[in-house]
Amino acid sequence: MNLKEVSELRRRFRMDRNAISRIYGCFVNSSREIVSYIDESMGILPQNEAEKYLNLLKKALSGKLGKNLIDIIFSTEQVADSDEHRLLMALRDSQLKNGNIREEFYQKIINSLDLGDSNYLILLAYDTYDVHHKNKNDEMDADASDAAFSYVVCCVCPVKERKAELGFFPGDNEFHSCAGQIVAAPELGFLFPAFDDRAANIYNALFYSRKTDEIHQEVIDSVFHTTAPMSAAEQKEAFQNALSEALGDACNMELVQSIHDRLRDQIEQHKESHDPEPLELSVSDAAAILRDNGVEEEKILAFRDSCATQFGDGATLNPANLIDSSRFEVKTADATISVGPEHSYLVETRIIDGRKYLLIPADEDIEVNGFGVRVKGE
């Protein structure tokens, strides 16, 4: 799925735009026991409660593609004959109305998910979307529908204890201590089937993880029986390892600055282009950056081999997962220097009298803990 397709579905989660008739789910305690079930008609829920449910489900389609939103790909064999794909299809085709199928799905989540000591809420909803035709200007034609897209969306939300506080009780006209449990934003979730080329793709699902460094592979194994792509944090670490192992002493400050600047430029240009497809960087593209910076061909070949080991042959990477484009940060054991990414060139390395130094020009005003200071010798 691309950004436009995700955004198109996210707009469904409003009271006047969706066709969700019921909300299903269950509340699970820290002992992995189902405490209660949810089977609520959206038509009779108070509007504020219905909107709360929709907002939680909508968040399972939030975040960045390739970071929080991860493509899950089924093999042809799985789609043809596998328990995991059959269950997902049964959830969708039954419109979630079959309690036995829902229970089987709940148990897959409960038996695999590790949220520590947290209670959590599993939510499920079924929706059918009349996919409107787009004209030559990429605008929706409200009077023309190409097909219906039926899908299931799921999210898993931690349920947290709220601190006891004073609250006003209108019946008693008094203040009393009150506490309770509140449903937090989803930790994970998914959409099935995927909405590719504005149509159902039963070979794919879209998985959501709130944390980019912890994508709950245990749930992906249980529900989808497939291996997810590397998380954003894993991609960044693997890329850094490939550079440091292959380049050795050639992996200096100037080279890393150049790589950061080149990748940041690509990210900014992609944003400005409004291209809905995720930005991709091939290993050959990364090798070209090294070559432009004068890295020896032998080391570039070692880098390509290391990338093949880390990511697999022919892998493409998302530059946004490899760097933090919002800042340029340099750390030592005792200090951290952070500058705006457009000013990364200000940070230099020098060896003075045998010691390594980080240098930053101080041509303008200097503040220390909010105090304006001057440099000795000015």
Task: Specify the residue positions occupied by each region the protein language model found.
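C-terminal, beta-strand-rich globular interaction domains
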Residues: E277, A286-E378
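Long, hydrophobic alpha/beta structural blocks
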Residues: R11-R17, S21-D324
